[in-house]
Each structure stands twice: as structure tokens, then as C-alpha cells.
Amino acid sequence: MDDFERRRELRRQKREEMRLEAERLSYQRNDDDEEEAARERRRRARQERLRQKEEGDVSGEVTEKSEVNAQNSVAEEETKRSTDDEAALLERLARREERRQKRLQEALERQKEFDPTITDGSLSVPSRREVNNVEENEITGKEEKVETRQGRCEIEETETVTKSYQRNNWRQDGEEEGKKEEKDSEEEKPKEVPTEENQVDVAVEKSTDKEEVVETKTLAVNAENDTNAMLEGEQSITDAADKEKEEAEKEREKLEAEEKERLKAEEEKKAAEEKQKAEEEKKAAEERERAKAEEEKRAAEERERAKAEEERKAAEERERAKAEEERKAAEERAKAEEERKAAEERAKAEEERKAAEERAKAEKERKAAEERERAKAEEEKRAAEEKARLEAEKLKEKKKMEEKKAQEEKAQANLLRKQEEDKEAKVEAKKESLPEKLQPTSKKDQVKDNKDKEKAPKEEMKSVWDRKRGVPEQKAQNGERELTTPKLKSTENAFGRSNLKGAANAEAGSEKLKEKQQEAAVELDELKKRREERRKILEEEEQKKKQEEAERKIREEEEKKRMKEEIERRRAEAAEKRQKVPEDGVSEEKKPFKCFSPKGSSLKIEERAEFLNKSAQKSGMKPAHTTAVVSKIDSRLEQYTSAVVGNKAAKPAKPAASDLPVPAEGVRNIKSMWEKGNVFSSPGGTGTPNKETAGLKVGVSSRINEWLTKTPEGNKSPAPKPSDLRPGDVSGKRNLWEKQSVEKPAASSSKVTATGKKSETNGLRQFEKEP
């Protein structure tokens, strides 16, 4: 709330200031109106004094007081304004006196006009007195307000504006006389008039007013005593006016003389003050000049002394710098010698390192060749094992087929036995229906018939097995009846139909096996083609590696040569710098480090300076070499990469069973291709068989075994021999990796079972052996 009140008060003050500023501007514009109103008031007051000549001393005193108040108020207003020069003041005084004389004459003429009607004038005196009293009261009240306004704050200046508007109305009433007294307003408004001058003007006006009052009194007495004495009164008035004029002239001259003397005294005083001030300023300037000259003299002496000191120090500095330069030259020579030796040692170490790298590389290649030979032997061994496994599988498959055929024959025999029993039952029924004459008469014959019936199925089964095995049929034994022949014929017909069905099924299975064999042959051809493509890719990579190695050696030779040239050039530059010893201390500022120390600790600081110089120069040489190497980093990126790979490969790998050999970069890429399955037609893993091979199972394996055993020349021509394997052949690496992974105890449980799991030599997928 207090903040709100404070802001509101500030806004109110700003509005008030703006309003007062506007009123001040209007007041300045209305100064002329105020001056005209003051002149109008004085003119009316003088007229009223002339009109009140018939009144008593009371009215005279009232007019005197009002005039004095008016003059005092005007004087107070005039004290706030500035005056012109002395000549303008005198001219204004002269013009004012002339106008006063004219106004007196006009008053006398108006008095003469009032004389014939003196009674009317006496009757109207009270009324005019009341009007004059009202006007005088208003004028005095206004003048008092003007006086109080000058003592108040700026907020109360609004009253002055309103009164100025009222005075403008009064000016319109007496516009004609206001025009006459425009110049008088300028005279009565002197700028910066002192209070003494205002008091003198007031005293003069008071004296003239008193004389006018006396004059009016005498005129009133003469008029009352006798109207016939008008001429004498007029004469006395004119005499009194002349006398007053002379006295006023004397008083004016006296005042002018006093004013001139006062102004002259003030001018002399001002001139003396100015002169004294000028003398003081002159003395101060001289003092400043003297102090400045002394300061300059001291500064010049100081500069001379400092210059001499600097020259002495510079000479000492040059001597010390010369000694330091000689010492540094000796150090530089020793340092150059050390650098030369260090460069030679570095070159020697570099050559030894390169030789070691070459040896390591040769050792690596030898080991790689041994690995390839071992992989080749392992491949041959695996091929032999695979062949033996295929033979064993073939025998096992043949045995299974025989068992299956035996089971089928047994089932067919059971079926035939059942059919034979049915037929025997039918034959028994027919026999019973035959006439009794055909039946055997004796029990001996019946027993014989029963035995024959029991033997007949056995002989039929025997004949069937003999026919299947290729044994010729034997003739019927003696004592066998002819009834067995139709039974055998019927059984032969039934068994022949079943054999035809089995033969048709066997032919359909053989056709399927042929189709699957053809598909397997096509897949083998594709695998051979892919293997040939891989071999070509490996050959190209090997050639590319050899070419890159040759280029790398050439670049290394060029780099060695360039480094030697750079070392020789720097040595020559260092020798030239040592020969050019600077004669002055200017070039010493360009040195990397200088140490000027006190004599006590000079030895330690010089040693420290030498160390810093050496380190600075070494740091200055290293960036140059680094920039030279970095400038060719794009062209040498492959060289650095191959060198890093060679360094890593140069480390001898421990032949542990759990560690894998570190292959070359090309072999690693091909190995990743093998692992991703991009080489094969299908991306299946080594452990998961193909869908087609999974469907083949026994038949495909038997056909593959037949293909391996019957057509060995077809296998030799497209498939590369173990001797055809190149140093970076991927198959050898892959088989070696598989061998080592098989040897691991952790992987043995998953890859090697009780019967064993092995991969084929031609890149075929693994076929698990049936348990």
C-alpha cells in the first residue's frame, strides 16, 4: 500500500511540475501584459489624485499610501530583472520625465474643464471617492498578492497567471494610453537594478506625489474661497508646476550624478578586482610554468641518467651474451655430434628391427607352410577315414536290406500259409462231398492221407524258397498223390502275384534313388566349381599381398633415404648457425631461452638453461618430423596397418590344444565367409544336415558310396588334390580349426559321439551316423 501511495504521489508531482512549467512559459509570454497593467494602475492613481483635490488630507494620505504600495510592488518586481547599460538608463529617465510633464498638463486642462460645473463635481465627489476607494482596494489587494506570490513556492504561481489575465482586461480598457507608455514599461523594468536605485526612485516619486497633494489642496482652498480667484489659482498652479519641475529636474540631475558616481565606483571596483584577478592568474601561470620547467628538467636529467644506465647495462649484456653464445656454440656442436650418433643408432636399430621383422615374417611363413602341410596330411587321413566309414556304412546298409527282405519274405510266407489253410479247408469239404467210394477204406489209408496233407504245405514252402534261391524243383516222391499238384499250382499263382507287386515297388524305389543320385552329383559339381573359384580368389589375394609387400619395402627405403637427407640438411643448417655468431644483442632476443642470473647461483641456473635449451630444440625438431610423416599418412595407412598385423603375428603362438592359430588377413576373411555360409548354396551350419540329404538318409549315402567306389576318375579330375592346396587355402585352415576344436575336451561331447562324427573332404555337409 505504501508503494502504491508513493507512486501516486510521484505521478501527482510530475503532473504538477508539467503544469507549472507550462504556466511559467505563459508567464514569460505575459510579462509585457503585467507591465502594461502596472502602468495603467499608476496612471489611474495619478488621475484619482488630481480628481480628489477637493477632498481632505485623509483622502490624500490614502492615495499616497496606495501609490507608495504600488511603487514598492513595482520596485520589488523590477529588482528581479536585469538592467541595460548606463546610456539606455539615462535615456529612459529622460523620456519618463517628459511623459510626466505631459500628463500634468493634461490634468490641468481637465481641471479647467471641470471648473464651470464645480457644483456637479462636488456632488459627484462622494460617488467618485467610493469608486476610487474600491479600485484602490482592488489594486492594493492585487499588488499584495503579487508580493506574496514572489515569496511563495512555484506551485502558487497559478495565482499570478489568473491576475495577469485580469490585468489584460484592464489593459483593454486603457488601450490607447497603454500604447503611449510601452516604452515607459521598458524603462521601468531595468534588469538587475540594485535596491538602492529602486529606493531612490521611490523617494523621488513620493516627493512629487506630496507636491501634487499640496497643489491639489491649495487649489481646493482657492476654489472654496472664491470662484473669481480661478485665474490666480491657475497662475499659482502653473507657478507651482514650474517650481516643481525645476525641483524635479534638480533632483533628477542629482540622482543621475549619484548614479553615475556609483556606477563609476562599481566599474572601478570591478576593474580593480579584474586586475587583481588577472595578476593572480598571471602569478599562478608563472608558477605553473616554473614548476613545469623544473619538472621537465628533472625528467630530462632522469632520462639521461636512465639512458646512461641502460647503455652500461647493454654493454654488460652484450659481453655476457657473447660469452653465452660461445658457450652455446660449443654445446651446440656437442649436441649435433650427439644427435648424429643418436641418428645413426636409431637407423641401426631401425635396420635391426626391420631385419627382426623379416626374420619373424619368414618364421611365420615357415610355420604357415608347416601348418598347411600338416593340414594336408590331416586332410588325406580324413579322406581315408571317410572312405572306410562309407564302406562300413555300405555294408551295414546292405545287411539292413537283407534283413528287410527276410522280414518281407516271412510275412509273405505267413500269408501263403494262411491262404493254403483256407484252401485245404475247402478241399476237405469237397472230399467229404465225394462219394464214399473215393474215400479210403482202411484206417491205414486215412492216416497216410493225413500225413500227406501235413507234408504238402511244407514241401510247397520249400519249393517257394528254392525257386527264390534258384534251386531247381525236385520230382515228386513215390507214394505222393496227384491231389497235391493243383494245390501247388494255386499257391504258385498267389505267390507270383505278390512277387510282381514287390518288383514294382523295388523299381519305383530305384528310380527315386537315381533321381536323388543325380541331384547329389549336381550339388557336388557346384561345390567343385565354388572350390575352384575360392582357389582363384586366394591366388589373387596372395599376389596382391606380395605386391603390397614389395610396395611397402620400396616406400620404407624411400622413407629411410628421406630421413637421412633430412638429418644431413639439419646438420648443415646447425653448422651454418654456429658459424653466424650475432654481433649485437638484438638477435639474442630471438633465442629460445636466456638466463641472466646473479653471480652466486649462476652455475645451477646455467645448467638449467642448457637443459631447457636442449628440450626446446628437441621439441622443435619433433613436430617437423611428425608433420612430415603425417603429411603422407594417407598414402602410408595400409603400410602401417600391415606392419601392426605383422608385429602381432610375429609373436610365437603357444601350440596349446585350446588356442586357435592366428590366420592371415585374407584367410580370416575367407574363414568368415565359411562361417557365415556364403560359400555354400545353403546357409546351414555344419552340424545341421540339408533338407534333401535328410530326406535321402540311407539311399543317398549308398549312392554316394557307389559313386566313390565305381567312378574314382570322376572324383579326381574336378576335385583338387591335397597337393593342390595353396599356402592360404581356406579348406586346410578350416579343417585344421575343426580338428583342434574336436580335440578340445569341452567340445568333444557335442561333436564326437560313441560311433563318431566326421566331415567329408569335398566340402559336403556332415552326415550323422545312425546309432
UniProtKB/Swiss-Prot annotation:
PANTHER family: CALDESMON (PTHR18949:SF0). Residues 251-390 are annotated as: 10 X 13 AA approximate tandem repeats. Residues 23-91, 104-599, 676-771 are annotated as: Disordered. Actin- and myosin-binding protein implicated in the regulation of actomyosin interactions in smooth muscle and nonmuscle cells (could act as a bridge between myosin and actin filaments). Stimulates actin binding of tropomyosin which increases the stabilization of actin filament structure. In muscle tissues, inhibits the actomyosin ATPase by binding to F-actin. This inhibition is attenuated by calcium-calmodulin and is potentiated by tropomyosin. Interacts with actin, myosin, two molecules of tropomyosin and with calmodulin. This is Caldesmon. Phosphorylated in non-muscle cells. Phosphorylation by CDK1 during mitosis causes caldesmon to dissociate from microfilaments. Phosphorylation reduces caldesmon binding to actin, myosin, and calmodulin as well as its inhibition of actomyosin ATPase activity. Phosphorylation also occurs in both quiescent and dividing smooth muscle cells with similar effects on the interaction with actin and calmodulin and on microfilaments reorganization. Residues 523-580, 622-632 are annotated as: Tropomyosin-binding. It comes from Gallus gallus (Chicken). The lineage of its organism: Eukaryota, Metazoa, Chordata, Craniata, Vertebrata. GO terms for biological process: actin filament bundle assembly; muscle contraction; negative regulation of calcium-dependent ATPase activity.
